[in-house]
């Protein structure tokens, strides 16, 4: 009995793992998601080796034909299987050596058939997805080829606009800003100005009457309007649109509705005013009001182009605003500190190697002056997002100068006007951007504000320099007297 048991155990040990492994392999058998990609990629590599002179678009076309053929084979195989129906049944694989449970064979056979159908359906879906992916890739390459190989004649110029032909593919169908009809991308050629973004049919591009906003913003006499404009009446405009002179009114049909542009104060027709909204620079400057308000298409394109340009002088226009607005005062203080810190970074080899001024890359004009702002920066100031960013950059700059860099720290100052009683205060290193300090306007030496005012604004460093310049004069005068005596 022991031998029988041992042989049975050996039989179970030898047969059970293989049976379990085969069952598990059928139960979890799935198509690898990358299998089709690898198969198509190998086919494309073979095609490139045999067709070296062809371009990538032709290779994608060959891959598309390959995927279509494979998908067609799977569909034909599926149709044949459905026609056979119940007449042809797949024989179940003999998994268990003994035949005590014959009904298990039918169950496993049906399971194999079901998994086989699922695998074929999965492969069909993967080939279909690959066909869609390759088709989109081929269309993108063709569109790029059209744009990149376009000659100067393909660029249409009118009223300063630089209209460039656009590809057929896209997310939505835009509206032509000349004829006001929809641009059906699949059946109509259309162009877009590379400067201001104006869109028009290919046939309408030469009929544009609006001057490009990029041309207006680059003129020598261009100035951003920072004055609040009064609303003009229909009578002042002779009941005409301020741009295209089309008839407008308030009580007529929708096509003649008069729409106000808050930037210029003029009235426009619906073709020239699409109810676009934008923050008005004049309201930001005078009221710190960044609420978007309706503007016409021309103004919207202009404000979008100059949004990052430093065109607004806060010191000249709104001195009272700086006085009563706490955040604006702090921003002006940080900007003055940036200019002082720039002097340290220019003479520091480590700062140049780290390119530490790149932290102000989004505000590059901050290292040139402390008064000019762009409309976008003033809008961020009103929203409360500008000041935290500048505070963070200021902390990084100050940490480099005071703690991390010995070269920058060595260019600090000691207050020479402090009393000997305050030893800790006297031995503290001061910098031009340190709080409660004053700098001499002549030699730029830094002192505590209270000490400098207590000494009647007298700078000991300037006094030493003045004495050193007087010594050669006294020596030269004494030499002249001795020469006269002799």
Curated annotation (Swiss-Prot):
Keywords: Metal-binding, Repeat, Zinc, Zinc-finger
Domain of life (superkingdom): Eukaryota
Pfam families found in the cross-reference section: RH_dom
InterPro entries from the UniProt entry: C1-like_sf, DEF8, DEF8_C1, PE/DAG-bd, RH_dom
PROSITE patterns referenced in this protein's UniProt entry, alphabetically: ZF_DAG_PE_2 (PS50081)
An MF annotation (GO) of this entry: zinc ion binding
Zinc finger extent (Phorbol-ester/DAG-type): 160-212, 393-459
Family: Belongs to the DEF8 family.
Name of this chain's protein: Differentially expressed in FDCP 8 homolog
């Amino acid at each position: 009995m022991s031998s029988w048991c041992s042989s049975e155990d050996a039989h179970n040990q030898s047969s059970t793992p293989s049976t379990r492994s085969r069952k598990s392999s059928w139960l979890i058998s799935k198509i690898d998601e990358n299998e089709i990609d690898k198969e198509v990629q190998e086919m494309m590599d073979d095609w490139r080796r045999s067709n070296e002179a062809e371009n990538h678009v032709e290779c994608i076309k060959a891959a598309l034909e390959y995927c279509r053929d494979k998908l067609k084979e799977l569909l034909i195989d599926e149709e044949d299987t459905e026609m056979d129906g119940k007449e042809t049944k797949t024989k179940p694989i003999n998994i268990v050596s003994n035949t005590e449970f014959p009904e298990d064979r039918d169950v496993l056979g049906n399971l194999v058939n079901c998994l086989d159908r699922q695998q074929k359906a999965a492969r069909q879906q993967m080939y279909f997805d690959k066909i869609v992916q390759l088709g989109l890739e081929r269309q993108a390459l063709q569109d790029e080829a059209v744009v990149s190989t376009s000659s100067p004649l393909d660029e249409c110029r009118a009223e300063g606009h630089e209209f460039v032909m656009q590809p057929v593919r896209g997310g939505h169908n835009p509206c032509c800003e000349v004829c006001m009809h929809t641009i059906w991308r699949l059946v109509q050629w259309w162009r877009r100005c590379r400067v201001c973004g104006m869109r028009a049919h290919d046939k309408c591009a030469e009929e544009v009457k609006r001057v490009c906003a990029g041309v207006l913003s680059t003129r020598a006499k261009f100035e951003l309007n920072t004055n609040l404009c009064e609303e003009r009446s229909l009578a002042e405009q002779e009941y005409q649109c301020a741009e295209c002179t089309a008839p407008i009114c308030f009580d007529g049909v929708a096509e003649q509705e008069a729409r106000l542009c808050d930037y210029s104060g003029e009235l426009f027709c619906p073709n020239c005013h699409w109810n676009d909204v934008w923050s008005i620079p004049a309201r930001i400057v005078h009221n710190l009001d960044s609420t978007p308000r309706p503007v016409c298409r021309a103004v919207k394109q202009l404000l979008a182009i100059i949004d990052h340009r430093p065109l607004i002088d806060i010191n000249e226009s709104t001195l009272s605003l700086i006085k009563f607005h706490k955040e604006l005062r702090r921003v002006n203080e940080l900007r003055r500190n940036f200019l002082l810190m720039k002097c340290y970074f220019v003479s520091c080899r480590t700062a140049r190697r780290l390119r530490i001024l790149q932290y102000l890359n989004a505000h590059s004009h901050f290292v040139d002056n402390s008064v000019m702002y762009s409309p976008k920066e003033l809008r961020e100031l009103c929203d409360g997002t500008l000041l935290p960013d500048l505070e963070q950059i200021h902390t990084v700059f100050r940490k480099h100068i005071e703690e991390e860099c010995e070269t920058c720290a060595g260019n600090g100052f000691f207050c020479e006007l402090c009393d000997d009683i305050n030893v800790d205060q006297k031995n503290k290193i001061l910098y031009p951007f340190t709080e409660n300090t004053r700098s001499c306007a002549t030699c730029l030496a830094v002192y505590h504000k209270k000490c400098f005012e207590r000494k009647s604004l007298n700078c000991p460093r300037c006094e030493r320099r003045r004495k050193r310049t007087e010594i050669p004069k006294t020596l030269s005068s004494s030499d002249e007297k001795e020469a006269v005596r002799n």
